[in-house]
Design a protein with these regions (language model features):
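Conserved ABC ATPase "signature" region
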Residues: 89-105
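Conserved catalytic motifs of ABC-family nucleotide-binding domains
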Residues: 67-77, 81, 86
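Catalytic Walker B motif of ABC-type/P-loop ATPase nucleotide-binding domains
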Residues: 134-138
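Hydrophobic anchor residue at the start of the ABC signature
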Residues: 123
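Helix-to-loop junction immediately C-terminal to a conserved catalytic motif
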Residues: 32
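Conserved ABC transporter NBD signature motif
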Residues: 40-48, 57
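Conserved ABC ATPase signature
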Residues: 109-113, 117
Length: 190
């Protein structure tokens, strides 16, 4: 539960750092309208997000979940999966490259990839939306060292987005974000 939170997300990368249960993932859910606040308001470009069309908001605010959840089908199908991406003319190769995977992966079965590769497909899916804001919920939590390094490398190469990275790893926050916001028990502590 969040309490009295007043936070502006600006261009560049912001890390939300805190222990489990501190409200980091809850905040991401509010930013992408996977949940609405019980009280208070979440603004996007000065407008209450509850006044915005949910699908339009989710096109503008991409989300990479903690655990990859590919849909049945190819990597290309998965990159094209999401609000506004049903148009098969969307080229999945550029976002896949940005996410650190070669386009040779496009015809592979997404369900047969490693967890690290699946996580990069989830990143490519979010990037295919060409979002203004990218939300990352512990994107490397379930990855081994090599896969984690590959995802971090892909994230480090992104430019022109507002990125919100949820992590409990201070070193990762320092590597990837220009701004670190600490949460404890639903409150800002910095």
């Amino acid at each position: 539960m969040l309490d009295g939170l007043d936070l502006a997300i600006e261009p560049g990368a912001t890390a939300l750092l805190g222990p489990s249960g501190s409200g980091k993932s809850s905040l991401l859910r509010l930013l992408n309208r996977l949940a609405d606040p019980d009280r208070g308001v979440v603004h996007f470009h000065g407008r209450d997000v509850r006044e915005l069309d949910v699908l339009e908001l989710r096109r503008r605010v991409g989300l990479v979940p903690q655990l990859p959840a590919p849909v049945p089908g190819t990597v290309a199908d998965n990159v094209r999966y999401g609000p506004g991406l049903e148009d098969l003319s969307v080229d999945p190769a550029p976002p896949l490259r940005l996410a650190g995977l070669d386009p040779s992966f496009l015809e592979r079965d997404a369900g047969r990839l490693s967890v690290g590769e699946q996580q990069r497909v989830m990143l490519a899916r979010a990037l295919a939306l060409e979002p203004e804001v990218l939300l990352l919920d512990e994107p490397t939590a379930s990855l081994d060292g090599d896969a984690k390094a590959a995802v971090e490398s892909a994230l480090g190469g992104l430019r022109g987005l507002s990125i919100v990275l949820v992590t409990h790893e201070a070193d990762q926050a320092e590597r990837l974000a220009g701004r670190i916001v600490r949460l404890e028990r639903g409150r800002l502590v910095t």
